[in-house]
Amino acid sequence: MSSLNNEEWDLLISGKKATLQYPIPLLCYPAPEVVSIAQIIDHTQLSLSATGSQIDVLCAEAKEYGFATVCVRPDYVSRAVQYLQGTQVGVTCVIGFHEGTYSTDQKVSEAKRAMQNGASELDMVMNYPWLSEKRYTDVFQDIRAVRLAAKDAILKVILETSQLTADEIIAGCVLSSLAGADYVKTSTGFNGPGASIENVSLMSAVCDSLQSETRVKASGGIRTIEDCVKMVRAGAERLGASAGVKIVNETRLGNRQVDEPMEPTNY
């Protein structure tokens, strides 16, 4: 795949798009067990002004509530790993965050450092300006370089769907999956609207059509248990949220509202 030029990638992506069933169905996956929703949440603190004590609180909450991972910036990986030692909670480190325009060498360096410091998962921002310019070979090689530098990590590639067209989202999913990503992720949460049912459904449909093991992570604007249920029903298997404690407490209080069925949409 790394030897394909942009024109060849364009043909491949167009072929994958042609296999999709239109209209893309919404909310066609089973609803989650809300009592165990914490197990698929990456509990997130990515503020540039975050302090060490805030990371400690994040980790303490993750231990108490049983979140999948904590998601932090590179400088806090070691601290989070140390705090969570002996627990089942993983540590996710963001890479190339949040612009995605870091050089490939910078992303690889961040990935290696994160792994050395104990991160178990990486959330890498795709160079989405390249994607919009149809620089598909560069996008693929950028992701592939991080994949090869962190072979033991779960790798999630952030598309930044708010900045992309539907066709670009399809292309981003194809490139990420073929480069070896474990997940494609909607958003950084720092650039426009976050996850939408339509985009998560489209990403899920693309991954399904590829018959790959790449899954979908929804993030950005997920603040309630209802938001979580909708995203899972749209196909997300992991959720990123800074409101994880509030969400889990909703389930404990019995607030388990499930969204109403929606009609399929067409891209």
From Swiss-Prot:
Pfam family, one: DeoC
Catalytic reaction(s) noted: 2-deoxy-D-ribose 5-phosphate = D-glyceraldehyde 3-phosphate + acetaldehyde
Taxonomy, superkingdom: Eukaryota
Cellular compartments annotated: Cytoplasm
InterPro entries hit by this protein: Aldolase_TIM, DeoC, DeoC/FbaB/LacD_aldolase, DeoC_typeI
Catalytic residue list: D123 (proton donor/acceptor), K185 (schiff-base intermediate with acetaldehyde), K217 (proton donor/acceptor)
GO biological process, one term: carbohydrate catabolic process
UniProt KW Chaperone keyword: no
GO CC terms of this entry: cytoplasm
Keywords: Cytoplasm, Lyase, Schiff base
Enzyme nomenclature, EC number: 4.1.2.4
One term of GO molecular function: deoxyribose-phosphate aldolase activity
Pathway annotation from the record: Carbohydrate degradation; 2-deoxy-D-ribose 1-phosphate degradation; D-glyceraldehyde 3-phosphate and acetaldehyde from 2-deoxy-alpha-D-ribose 1-phosphate: step 2/2
Class in the EC hierarchy, top level: lyase
HAMAP family in the record: DeoC_type1
The family this protein is said to belong to: Belongs to the DeoC/FbaB aldolase family. DeoC type 1 subfamily.
Task performed by this protein: Catalyzes a reversible aldol reaction between acetaldehyde and D-glyceraldehyde 3-phosphate to generate 2-deoxy-D-ribose 5-phosphate.
UniProt name for this protein: Deoxyribose-phosphate aldolase
Species whose genome carries this gene: Coccidioides immitis (strain RS) (Valley fever fungus)
Lineage: Eukaryota, Fungi, Dikarya, Ascomycota, Pezizomycotina
